[in-house]
Regions:
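ABC ATPase "signature
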Residues: 217-218, 226, 298
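Conserved ABC ATPase "signature" region
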Residues: 108-127
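Conserved catalytic motifs of ABC-family nucleotide-binding domains
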Residues: 153
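Catalytic Walker B motif of ABC-type/P-loop ATPase nucleotide-binding domains
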Residues: 157-160
Length: 312
């Protein structure tokens, strides 16, 4: 658990982060979102003391993060930046092994961990471990950057605009990889983004920052349905809000008995994807199938549209 208590960072008379308090639960994903200059990166960097607070405290599992030397704290907390930050003169395997080497793991354990992480990120160790960063694509470099941050088995992973430099297709894959890895290891993830769509997609909770303050800290559903003020409302946007809301839930519990023709919609599809398919194909109803292709019932376009309305 990460607890921020009255956290403040001033540069002269300017409060870049101003009296921020909230708690991030273990094994969760927290998105810190806001416009440029809102204080989001400074806030995150105070968790691992890359930036020291002026006032307030950061507690990690009840322990003040100032009780450990900064270098030791940072070895326990994974950190990923936008442009991967890989050492260009080291191979992929050597990059991933950086922190395990620093903390004294033996060679066999390091080699096993490097191979495990490369396989998890679908990078064949026999092919990629000996490559250098310049021999990788942008998406591969970013995956290696995340693997390096996870190498020493940290409980916490901090990520600063981790997907901002990736093209849309690679970005979607990288986001899916991150959620799969988080589910496997149970890592507590805190990431900074200026993209509300990304925050809604990845975050269990979202902290919205404006002018150094957290103006709302809530679940994606609450952020979408009950924005705290006009700033949050504008940040969400109105044009595709219903679709964003639908993206948070699956179609499984909306399936009705009945039959319909045409290509089926997967039971684990989001309501947003299901509605998009029905609109695009011009259908009012579609069959729903499980992963084995067995028909489970039907989903109606009218029901999905009704679910997109703002909750009362």
């Amino acid at each position: 658990m990460i607890e921020l208590r009255n956290l403040t960072k001033r540069y002269g008379d300017v409060a870049v982060v101003d009296d921020v308090s909230f708690t991030m639960q273990p094994r969760s994903v927290t998105a810190i979102v806001g416009t440029s200059g809102s204080g989001k990166t400074t806030l995150m960097r105070m968790i691992n003391r890359m930036t020291e607070p002026t006032d307030g405290a950061v507690l990690i599992d009840g322990e003040d993060n100032r009780s450990l030397p900064p270098h030791e704290l940072r070895r326990r907390i994974g950190y990923v930046i936008q442009n991967h930050g890989l050492f260009p003169h080291r191979t992929v395997g050597e990059n991933i092994a950086t922190v395990p080497n620093l903390i004294g793991w033996d060679k066999e354990r390091i080699a096993a961990r490097v191979s495990e992480l490369l396989e998890l990120f679908q990078l064949d160790p026999s092919d990629f471990a000996g490559r250098y960063p310049h021999e990788l694509s942008g998406g591969q470099q970013q995956r290696v950057g995340v693997a390096r941050a996870l190498a020493a088995e940290p409980n916490i992973l901090l990520m600063d605009e981790p997907f901002g430099a990736l093209d849309p297709i690679i970005r979607t894959k990288a986001q899916a990889d991150l959620l799969a890895i988080q589910k496997r290891f149970g890592t507590t993830i805190v990431f900074v983004t200026h993209d509300m769509e990304e925050a809604i997609h990845l975050g269990d909770r979202i902290a919205v920052m404006d002018g150094g303050k957290v103006v709302q800290y809530a679940s994606p559903k609450e952020i979408l349905s009950r924005p705290a003020n006009m700033f949050v409302d504008r940040l969400i946007g109105t044009g595709d809000r219903p679709f964003r809301y639908l993206s948070l839930s699956g179609v499984g519990d909306l399936v009705e008995q009945g039959e319909a023709s045409g290509a089926p919609i997967a039971r684990d599809a989001s309501r947003r994807d299901a509605l998009a398919e029905l609109l695009w194909s011009g259908r009012d109803v579609a069959p729903v199938a499980d992963s084995a292709g067995a028909r489970l019932g039907i989903i109606r376009r009218a029901r999905l549209i009704a679910e997109a309305a703002r909750p009362a």
